From Swiss-Prot:
Family affiliation: In the N-terminal section; belongs to the OHCU decarboxylase family. In the C-terminal section; belongs to the uricase family.
This protein's encoding gene: pucL
Induction: Expression is very low in excess nitrogen (glutamate plus ammonia) and is induced by TnrA during imiting-nitrogen conditions (glutamate). Expression is further induced when allantoin or uric acid are added during limiting-nitrogen conditions.
EC number: 4.1.1.97, 1.7.3.3
Function: Catalyzes two steps in the degradation of uric acid, i.e. the oxidation of uric acid to 5-hydroxyisourate (HIU) and the stereoselective decarboxylation of 2-oxo-4-hydroxy-4-carboxy-5-ureidoimidazoline (OHCU) to (S)-allantoin.
Chain residue ranges for the region called OHCU decarboxylase: 1-174
The protein, known as: Uric acid degradation bifunctional protein PucL
Binding positions (urate): T239, D240, F349, R366, I414, Q415, N441
Region Urate oxidase: start-end pairs: 175-494
Reaction catalysis annotation: 5-hydroxy-2-oxo-4-ureido-2,5-dihydro-1H-imidazole-5-carboxylate + H(+) = (S)-allantoin + CO2; urate + O2 + H2O = 5-hydroxyisourate + H2O2
Gene Ontology biological process: allantoin metabolic process; purine nucleobase metabolic process; urate catabolic process
Origin species: Bacillus subtilis (strain 168)
Top-level taxonomic group: Bacteria
GO molecular function, one term: urate oxidase activity
Length: 494
């Protein structure tokens, strides 16, 4: 691997020898790039080399295109092309497949006067075959420009294979783009079964007859810098293509959870587009609930009619990045959002600081209305994909745990409530490392304090602003609570 410093210090001949194979049998591009030094980054080098091609006359560009091999054939080609085609599966074609590729390539060459070119890295032989069929329908000028675009992509991949930017001291900039509100609905996804059952919840699985998800996709990588600085879209994956990619892969997903779907899509994105360095996917579930049905004089649950739920919703977040040939999950968590719970009594708030700024009265028994966002992380992210359903933690179970603890606890504060909810979740699911909370206090204001003949009261919405809390409950917290409970049990027995 070479660094930018290495390339900038080479003499012209050494640089030409080093970069001569980046463009197929066209070392003249590397030779001319020597005069454009210094190169500040891989993207800068790629931009300058492609700029040389763009500035060349039409005949020179056509000559460059014609130097590329015909995909899927056995004709002589450069070592780089051999390796790229083998990785795409073109080196192991069955005889019938080989003859099909040979025929289509000849048809393409006869139609346009130059070979079919495609940056095959990350693609399968099926992808290549489909692209060849589709592009046979194009106009010549469209294909001429597309051939150059594919050559630029190939050059980018080849540069990334031999150049490292490790050790460069420039600060990494924020640079990403993506697509939001990618709605996808799937019927008859594989059911989620075999989850661990807990005392606080009746949840036993999901039939997944109707599944909805709202996905946000954000990608990053140095390859996209020219699109910002120069308006060069050569390596840009259109956000509309991202939308199509996500929606169509919901059809081929064979798992049972949103977490697993995001993992599947992230890997497919990075496998397909090898110039992407990072991807962040957020999937918010769109829940559907089966409606009642009256069949054969009995009330049952419909297997056909579902109601979209407007209650709390679950969300999953996954971040992945490329490191060489390895894809690493850098962050993954699951979350239940906008869980709104009210407990009509058994809540207090007393003993807080009272000074000249205090107007809030102490209350030994009040209703408490809380909004909760609860997120959890696994020690092993593979557990979130439900390959072993018994180690998967469902949002429905977290919801039921939260309401159960709220019911059981004499609540002295929201802070104490979320602490005990978190400890209970970690006690039930030892595969989790921590549980985080974002909570808000939306307790109602009293309108009528006493109603004759009733213990009820009348309330209204609270005046803004609202109080909030952020807190993470750790595995250590849960262990401390477990020890305290054991000590209390021993003291009672004594």
């Amino acid at each position: 691997m070479f660094t930018m410093d290495d390339l900038n210090q080479m003499d012209t001949q050494t640089l030409t020898d080093t970069l001569g194979s980046i463009f197929e049998h066209s070392s003249w591009i590397a030779e001319r790039s020597a005069a454009l030094r210094p190169f500040s980054s891989l993207s800068d080098l790629h931009r300058k080399m492609t700029g040389i091609v763009k500035a060349a006359d039409r005949e020179t560009q056509l000559d460059l295109i014609k130097k590329h091999p015909r995909l899927g054939t056995k004709k002589t080609m450069s070592d780089d092309s051999v390796r790229e085609q083998q990785n795409a599966g073109l080196g192991k074609l069955e005889q019938q497949e080989y003859e099909e590729f040979l025929m289509l390539n000849e048809h393409y060459y006869d139609r346009f006067g130059f070979p079919f070119i495609l940056a095959v890295k990350g693609k399968t032989k099926q992808d290549i075959h489909q692209a060849l069929l589709a592009r046979l329908e194009s106009e010549r000028e469209t294909e001429f420009q597309q051939a150059l675009i594919e050559i630029y992509r190939i050059a980018r991949f080849r540069l990334a294979d031999i150049i490292t930017e490790k050790g460069e001291t420039q600060m990494k900039r924020t640079m990403s783009y993506g697509k939001g509100n990618v709605f996808a609905y799937r019927t008859y996804l594989k059911p989620l079964t075999g989850v661990k059952q807990i005392p606080e919840s009746s949840f036993a699985g999901r039939d997944n007859t109707v599944v909805g998800v709202d996905v946000t996709c954000e990608i990053g990588g140095e390859a996209f810098l020219p699109s910002f600085t120069d308006g060069d879209n050569t390596l840009v994956v259109a956000t509309d293509s991202m939308k199509n990619f996500i929606q169509r892969h919901l059809a081929s997903y064979e798992g049972t959870t949103t977490e697993g779907f995001l993992h599947y899509v992230a890997h497919r994105f990075l496998d397909t587009y090898s110039h992407m360095d990072t991807i962040t996917l957020t999937g918010e579930d769109i829940p559907f609930e089966a409606m009642p049905a009256y069949e054969e004089k009995e009330l049952s649950t419909s297997r056909l009619v579902f109601r979209r739920s407007r209650n709390e919703r679950s969300r999953s977040v996954l971040k992945a990045e490329r490191s060489g040939n390895t894809i690493t999950i850098t962050e993954q968590y699951s979350e239940i959002m906008d869980l709104q719970l009210v407990k009509v009594s058994g809540n207090s708030f007393v003993g807080f600081i009272r000074d000249e700024y205090t107007t809030l009265p102490e209350d030994g028994n009040r209703p408490l209305f809380v909004y909760l966002n609860i997120s959890w992380q696994y020690e092993n992210t593979n557990d979130s994909y439900a390959s072993d359903p018994a180690r998967y933690v469902a949002a429905e179970q977290v919801r039921d745990l939260a309401s159960t603890v709220f019911h059981e606890l004499e609540t002295p504060s929201i802070q104490n409530l979320i602490y005990h909810i978190g400890c209970r979740i970690l006690a039930r699911f030892p595969q989790l490392t921590d549980v985080s909370f974002q909570s808000q206090n939306h307790t109602w204001d009293t309108v009528v304090e006493e109603i004759p003949g009733s213990k009820g009261k009348v309330y209204t919405e609270p005046r803004p602003p609202y109080g909030f809390q952020h807190f993470t409950v750790t595995r250590e917290d849960a262990e401390k609570e477990k020890q305290k409970a054991a000590e209390k049990c021993r003291s009672l027995k004594a």
